[in-house]
Amino acid sequence: MAFTRRSFMKGLGATGGAGLAYGAMSTLGLAPSTAAPARTFQPLAAGDLIGKVKGSHSVVVLGGGPAGLCSAFELQKAGYKVTVLEARTRPGGRVWTARGGSEETDLSGETQKCTFSEGHFYNVGATRIPQSHITLDYCRELGVEIQGFGNQNANTFVNYQSDTSLSGQSVTYRAAKADTFGYMSELLKKATDQGALDQVLSREDKDALSEFLSDFGDLSDDGRYLGSSRRGYDSEPGAGLNFGTEKKPFAMQEVIRSGIGRNFSFDFGYDQAMMMFTPVGGMDRIYYAFQDRIGTDNIVFGAEVTSMKNVSEGVTVEYTAGGSKKSITADYAICTIPPHLVGRLQNNLPGDVLTALKAAKPSSSGKLGIEYSRRWWETEDRIYGGASNTDKDISQIMFPYDHYNSDRGVVVAYYSSGKRQEAFESLTHRQRLAKAIAEGSEIHGEKYTRDISSSFSGSWRRTKYSESAWANWAGSGGSHGGAATPEYEKLLEPVDKIYFAGDHLSNAIAWQHGALTSARDVVTHIHERVAQEA
């Protein structure tokens, strides 16, 4: 294969991460400019239907999560009569915030009651919002106050197993990054100086790259990484002649073989890069705000849908609420029920649609929150937000982004997915807690086991009305990768008067943004259809 500038930059990105590659590209004048794509959604205006379309038009929305409530909110702006049917007793669906008073019985029959102190909580579901997501636009429109979310913190730890002396050792992100970037910069600079890139880069290019690498890796004058203040201090600099004592770097071979840099690219991601945001008081604040705008008289909580059928008058939905069987017929229906659960309803959907719904496979994910009566992560580890990462089943430990310097706080003791979450799924809450504490203490020490006031956990595969964290499309590896599966495309089409919406029908699966954009798309299609049929 020809060795080109493009292949060189691609390899640089694979080994050093997007930050290293992009920095080098900028230095060489190769980095492209970026521009946000134009938004095409046009919100419906108040009175869009009045005096323009004959008669009234009604929509029944199945599900009071992000897609369902957003659909109802936008449709009401134009004068549609909307009824939302939600099986739970709260809005938000998989956007679920556990706080004092929360109670949940899972599919195993175990009931948990949350006893966190007033003002303390954690988000069992969605917890962060990227700057690019329209979720922030709705926070603005609905008056939901937001605050910064610590998605990355140089003081949190990485702890991985390997065949090196770093195996099972907790290393701060700042130290891991300083050593990894330092040694990589040293090796790349050496390769550049020895002529390995002569067929790719001009003399001026190499000079610019060497200058960049010297700065990026904090290299010595002779191009070596000898350590850096970037990795932290054993004793902090102070007054007078107290210059501090820098932490010594790990050996190059240990750093490379240990894989301590395996998670650095996480916050390079378009939807994970700082700044990130979250609502003050919990993510569910957004959906209580939607509820207030829509009106509780237009939302039926505790409504378990049993049937959804196209009929001559539109769509008839049957459900149970308060121990009684009820039904509603509307001109249109928007179904936001998780796709793998729709087939359980009595329905008259075509076979190919039912097959398409089954192609959206459920996934495993869960969290456990521990309330500590002492914020040891701040006072002892100097950690204010962010997450420690590990290859243990707990995957990561997320620290509070609020109530700084107070006397207590809720730590998310694990946020795991896939096979790692399956290790927790069949356990009782007490067993989950014990496992989380045992693994967490191997990262943060014995203090992790003390001063525990209460705890609460959630596993989405075991949660009624969800039975999944998010959808993975069969044959697509869980994401579309620029091309949709036939089953996915099938569900983008209405079945007579029934429309489907949700994050599973977006290119932002598992994000609120995905559900909200899907809802907007369906609202637009319904409104255009009503106008055309008038």
Swiss-Prot record:
Cofactor field: FAD
Tell me which Gene Ontology terms the entry assigns under biological process: amino acid catabolic process
Its predominant location is cytoplasm
- Give the cofactor note: Binds 1 FAD per subunit.
Q: What is its EC number?
A: 1.4.3.2
What domain of life is recorded for the organism? Bacteria
List the Gene Ontology MF annotations in alphabetical order: L-glutamate oxidase activity; L-lysine oxidase activity; L-phenylalaine oxidase activity; nucleotide binding
PROSITE patterns in the record, alphabetically?
Answer: TAT (PS51318)
Q: Which InterPro entries match?
A: Amino_oxidase, FAD/NAD-bd_sf, Flavin_monoamine_oxidase, TAT_signal
Which residues of this UniProt protein bind FAD? Answer: 66-67, 86-88, 94, 125-128, 305, 503, 510-512
Query: What does UniProt report about how this protein is used?
Result: Can be used for the preparation of D-amino acids by resolving racemic amino acid mixtures and for the production of alpha-keto acids.
| Gene Ontology CC annotations of this record | cytoplasm
Q: For binding substrate, which residues are annotated in this chain's numbering?
A: 128, 272, 415, 510
**Reaction it catalyzes:** an L-alpha-amino acid + O2 + H2O = a 2-oxocarboxylate + H2O2 + NH4(+); L-asparagine + O2 + H2O = 2-oxosuccinamate + H2O2 + NH4(+); L-methionine + O2 + H2O = 4-methylsulfanyl-2-oxobutanoate + H2O2 + NH4(+); L-phenylalanine + O2 + H2O = 3-phenylpyruvate + H2O2 + NH4(+)
User: Which UniProt key words apply to this protein?
Assistant: Cytoplasm, FAD, Flavoprotein, Glycoprotein, Nucleotide-binding, Oxidoreductase, Signal
Q: Which Pfam families match?
A: Amino_oxidase (PF01593)
Its localization reads: Cytoplasm
Modifications after synthesis and translation: Predicted to be exported by the Tat system.
Q: What does its pH dependence look like?
A: Optimum pH is 8-9.
Hey, what's the signal peptide range on this chain?
A: 1-45
Q: Briefly, what is this protein's role?
A: Catalyzes an oxidative deamination of basic, hydrophobic and aromatic L-amino acids, thus producing hydrogen peroxide that may contribute to the diverse toxic effects of this enzyme. Is active on most L-amino acid (39 on 43 tested) with the exception of L-Thr, L-Pro, and L-Gly.
**Assembly and partners?**
Homodimer; non-covalently linked.
The family assignment reads: Belongs to the flavin monoamine oxidase family. FIG1 subfamily.
The protein here is known as L-amino acid oxidase
